[in-house]
A protein has these predicted regions:
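Edge strands and adjacent loops of beta-rich recognition modules
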Residues: 13-36
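Surface-exposed helix-capping loop/turn segments at secondary-structure junctions
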Residues: 70-88, 153-155, 188-194, 260-264, ...
């Protein structure tokens, strides 16, 4: 791994897997270093503007790394840390800064990230913007993968076949559980407060609830279909699939809160026990079930069958209430009420129509351009979706005028009376802290 100032020299990979796992980038970078758990880390930025507060970014990245080191290996100097060294001798963050982009790929001792320039922290501006929190969540997610997927990994990935797609039913665990911890560990690292964390969790919950595909595809099926569905999305994806990232994250939440409510253990303990049981290597769902049984004091086969392999909604609201967090139901935004997803530039363009919604019942289709509405004999040009309520007033029955393949269609649309969305609020701060601020 590159830590020298200029990096010139000869590098040798032990095998093809190591070669494929080591990203290489040449150019002029900003570079900063820190230690976490006694291990040297390097942060490299390419494409950042001069306004970027690199000191803050470096310090916050260090806090994330230290929190995740503690999660997996305990605090430095503690008895629980004996013989539990991090599985790498150094680590590299490669941040490629672009005008508009987001994503990352984990490696055994590095990660390659794409971040938007506007999401970077700015000199003289100490605000914790939503964009910066998203960036920190990405850093947290990919760093957590160093343990959970690059070492602890699906048994199907014991040996890689670079000439074919590799399938597993466990992405709900490896991506979903990582997604659960990426934001939670920001909270435990002190980078966000309870309200900010619950806002992020709330977004995940609503994403799942607003995906009709959750009623037809399980998290295990979504994992297996990643190559053919998740990475080949179309206008009907939301109706036929569920994200193993978001659904898996909520499965992790339910497992964690169930274990804590029963007073035996937590998902934190399960993750560390799996690390030890599988010797930081390949694992199966049976390994996960065995550790749950060992730490939880009972078999969780019914829960796993329903949550992982079933399609019913998860008991999120009930479990949150047991941990001092309540769900408030609030009116949803207009697009959600109608069951559509749109883009608005010069017109209202329909991107997706969700199964069972008012728009589908009216006959609105993906790729339609919603050009106008007729209400009580009056016609109105529609350029922004939110203007619909202005024109409709108290009327629930209107006519939607859409352009489809250059033809104008008049479709009878009934506006739904009420559709709600969730908002999470702490009811019992002391009880919530046992989960949100947990050290175990």
């Amino acid at each position: 791994m590159l830590f020298r100032s200029r990096g010139f020299g000869t590098y040798l990979a032990a095998d093809d897997d190591e070669l494929a796992d080591c990203p290489v980038e040449l150019g002029a970078f900003w570079s900063g270093e820190f230690k976490a758990g006694g291990v040297p880390h390097r942060l490299v930025l390419a494409g950042a503007a001069e306004s970027c507060d690199t000191t803050r970014l470096l310090a916050d990245t260090q806090k994330i790394c230290e929190a995740e080191m503690r999660f997996w290996h305990g605090r430095p100097g503690s008895a629980s840390r004996a013989g539990k060294r991090p599985p790498f001798k150094n680590y590299l963050f490669m941040l490629n800064v672009v005008d508009d982009g987001y994503g990352g790929l984990e490696h055994r001792n590095s990660t390659a990230l794409i971040v938007s320039r506007r999401d970077l922290p700015r000199l003289g501006d100490g605000r914790q913007t939503d964009g910066y929190i998203t960036l920190l969540g990405l850093v947290s997610h990919e760093y957590f993968h160093t343990w959970n997927v690059k070492r602890l990994r699906p048994a199907e990935f014991t040996h890689f076949d670079y000439g074919a797609e590799n399938y597993t039913q466990l992405l709900w665990f490896f991506e979903g559980f990582t997604s659960y911890y990426d934001d939670l560990l920001l909270r435990r690292a002190g980078l966000i407060d309870d309200a900010a964390y619950l806002k992020l969790l709330n977004k995940t919950i609503n994403q799942v609830l607003q995906t009709p595909g959750r009623e037809v595809q399980s998290a295990a099926q979504a994992s297996f279909d990643a190559w053919v569905k998740y990475y080949r999305q179309d206008e009907n994806t939301a109706n036929t699939t569920v994200s193993y990232y978001t659904k898996g994250s909520l499965i992790a939440l339910c497992v964690d809160l169930t274990l804590r409510a029963e007073g035996n253990s937590s998902l934190d303990d399960v993750m560390r026990s799996l690390w030890a049981r599988c010797k930081a290597g390949p694992m199966t769902e049976a390994d996960f079930a065995a550790v749950l049984r060992e730490l939880g004091g009972r078999a969780y086969s019914r829960e796993l069958a329903a949550w992982v392999h079933g399609i019913r909604d998860l008991p999120v609201e009930e479990l949150l209430d047991k941990h001092g967090v309540v769900v408030l139901k609030e009116p949803a935004q207009l697009a959600q009420r109608l069951g559509i997803r749109v883009t608005e530039t010069s017109a209202v363009q329909i991107k997706q129509v969700l199964r069972g919604g008012a728009a589908e019942l009216a006959g609105i289709a993906a790729n339609d351009e919603w050009v106008g509405v007729e209400v009580a004999g009056n016609g109105w040009r529609l350029t922004k979706l939110d203007d619909l309520t202005l024109y409709a007033g108290d009327h629930r029955k209107i006519t939607a005028v859409v352009a489809r393949d250059r033809r104008l269609l008049r479709l009878d649309l009934t506006l739904p009376a009420a559709v709600t969305t969730w908002r999470l609020v702490v009811r019992d701060p002391a009880l919530a802290q046992l989960w949100l601020g947990a050290a175990h």
